[in-house]
């Protein structure tokens, strides 16, 4: 069978398998690649190939993640699967593998377990927009009522974390049986649930908005003045497009100001516009060199606002990862590194949390001493004197 070439014509979506340990996430991932390979839409990846995921470093944090890719008739997917629970926590908090949607795997034989709950909570906090459920090991449950009970329990759990539990598609099957068969045919009892699952993923998980279609934002990395021309701010465009003559805002650190883009340049060439992913210099009208600094952002007016107080989910590095050796307590004052700059902040731990140990993930409220342009889902590092001791994500903005 000739290998299908990667067609850029289909929309690309990033998904991942989440759920409790041993409920079958990796087996399901292997079964999806095998079923799609039988249909000429993927390359089969065996369980062992996925399970022995290489370790990657993201912001100084070691995360083991397996990446597989496959297509359906309508989409191209990049799928992440993590071997260990801690890897999921780190992955979701750092955004190392951005998920546009998730497949929540729940063993029909066991029902929802502690990590099922924790992964749903994390998905909610880090802004995974949608999920589809696979009730795995359905072959081990011969009682129809028991299956319905587990499904009900999963729906209630999802609803309790503000996911639309009543509407989320749930597909029951056996990933192992599908993997053992591997024919990938619609009428096969073993493979049908995998095909049905992917149809639901295709239909239910929304296509992500591309970075280029979002409102313009560029974190300022450097500023210099060009005599006779004015002030230039340089950085990598995070999202959107900026054109010459656009009105933009300078947000964060101090009062928000408005200005007009009088030039865009890249590799010393003048352009009409810069777009997401480009490293550019932006020439700003009437802005003095001292009016703008690293840590601020240039943005489409009204699209982002500066804040000092927010709720966050954070993962605190272990000693082995180069983090702290000791726990921290309420009132901890590290630096929070947002995009290009460090800002001191004070941590208020969630009620009932006495302290946070290295290796924990924790919910906290942070009060920064200087305002930073932020949205929900913005990622940050927690640092002490330039050394990364944690990673986090803004889950809610307070003020």
Curated annotation (Swiss-Prot):
Organism this protein belongs to: Syntrophotalea carbinolica (strain DSM 2380 / NBRC 103641 / GraBd1)
Gene symbol of the encoding locus: tuf2
Enzymatic reactions: GTP + H2O = GDP + phosphate + H(+)
Keywords noted in UniProt: Cytoplasm, Elongation factor, GTP-binding, Hydrolase, Magnesium, Metal-binding, Nucleotide-binding, Protein biosynthesis
UniProt name for this protein: Elongation factor Tu 2
Region (G2) residue spans: 60-64
InterPro entries for the chain: EF-Tu_GTP-bd (IPR041709), EF-Tu_GTPase (IPR050055), EFTu-like_2 (IPR004161), EFTU_2 (IPR033720), G_TR_CS (IPR031157), P-loop_NTPase (IPR027417), Small_GTP-bd (IPR005225), T_Tr_GTP-bd_dom (IPR000795)
Annotated residues for binding of GTP: 19-26, 81-85, 136-139
A GO CC term attached to the entry: cytosol
Gene3D superfamilies reported in the protein's UniProt record: P-loop containing nucleotide triphosphate hydrolases, Translation factors
Domain tr-type G: 10-209
EC numbers on record: 3.6.5.3
Region (G1): 19-26
Pfam families per the UniProt record, alphabetical: GTP_EFTU, GTP_EFTU_D2, GTP_EFTU_D3
Region ranges (G3): 81-84
Subunit description: Monomer.
Binding residues annotated for Mg(2+), in chain numbering: 26
The UniProt record lists the keyword Protein biosynthesis: yes
Region (G4) location: 136-139
Region feature (G5): 174-176
Record's function text: GTP hydrolase that promotes the GTP-dependent binding of aminoacyl-tRNA to the A-site of ribosomes during protein biosynthesis.
UniProt superkingdom: Bacteria
